[in-house]
Amino acid sequence: MSLSRPLRLFLLLLPLLGGLLLSMDWAGRQARQQALRAEGEQVRKQLDLYAGSLQTLIERFRSLPAVLALDPDLRAALAGPIDGELQQRLNLKLESINLAARSSTLELLDRTGLAVAASNWNLPTSYVGHNYGFRPYFRQTIAQGSGRFYAVGVISGIPGYFLSHAVRAEDGSFLGAIVVKLEFPDLERQWNQTPDLVLASDAKGIVFLANHAGWRYRELEPLDTVDRFELAETRQYDRQPLTPLRHQTLRSYGEDRRLARVESADGEKDYLWQSLDLPNDGWTLHLLRDTASIQDDVATARLAAAGTWLALVFLGLFLHQRWRIARL
């Protein structure tokens, strides 16, 4: 029984269309893999640069508290009572050192954590007279001789990285601590020059640095009861509401790279998400690159594959027609 003309046409077009779709799918997948691989290498290099600039900034000041802890004036002041005149001399000394070092603030704490002098003594947000014994960096300094802690300033409301070192008497007894605070506005402005999202999160997975304000103070992972209690006790992100950042992994490319779908104020968007641990400070640096350009590469590859397939089909039809004519 002979087939009808429409059916014959359908059976002819079916493998042609199937081949067209398969070639477009294959080309799209190959283009995606190549683009993700190339983008991943670029993202990792970019992230290494950001990590280097952040660590260089911190290392510039990491030794400052240890050096100041040896200052005889500071040691002598903490060893005895501090009157108004001595406190003013200490304030001016710290102000001068802070200006020369280009740190954000310097403060001198006694053995209870009370700020007896500070470089910002003449500002409304002065630390002088406030007790910081509850801050982890002070507790670490008592136990280990030095401490570090990123937090929002309780008085100033300005976030920063606190580095501290113990001030000790000649016999080694603990007298107090000298603390330097670092703020990172210049670093975030540098990050703003890229269209990518650049984030830094702490050990709890809370974003504390970001080149876009709406991404700061976001929870990358759910916080448990212990974490929330500790945050409240230390006032780490004092008066800053923490909101979850909803995201899901679409595909993993090793331990530190993945394709993720992230929900933000602009809606859902897919990112190539690269992470880099900073073990010295217990932080993780993240770079999120929009995959829109990758989608463009995929679409271009699919169109090229479709064009190639159709060209081969027409070439085949042409050769078939020539063969039929030659047989006549």
Tell me what each language-model feature is:
Residues 1-33, 37, 306-317:
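Extreme N-terminal signal-anchor transmembrane helix of membrane signaling/transducer proteins, especially
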Residues 16-80, 103, 146:
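Juxtamembrane extracytoplasmic/periplasmic/luminal helical "stalk" adjacent to the first N-terminal
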Residues 76-77, 113-120, 207-211, 274-275:
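Amphipathic coiled-coil signal-relay and dimerization helices
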Residues 83-92, 121-152, 216-263:
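Extracytoplasmic/periplasmic sensor domains and loops in membrane signaling proteins
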Residues 88-100, 177-235:
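Solvent-exposed, extracytoplasmic
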Residues 99-100, 118-190:
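Extracytoplasmic/periplasmic ligand-binding sensor regions of membrane-associated signaling proteins
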Residues 230-303:
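Extracellular/periplasmic juxtamembrane segments that couple receptor/chemosensory ectodomains to their
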Residues 291-328:
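Cytoplasm-proximal transmembrane signaling helix
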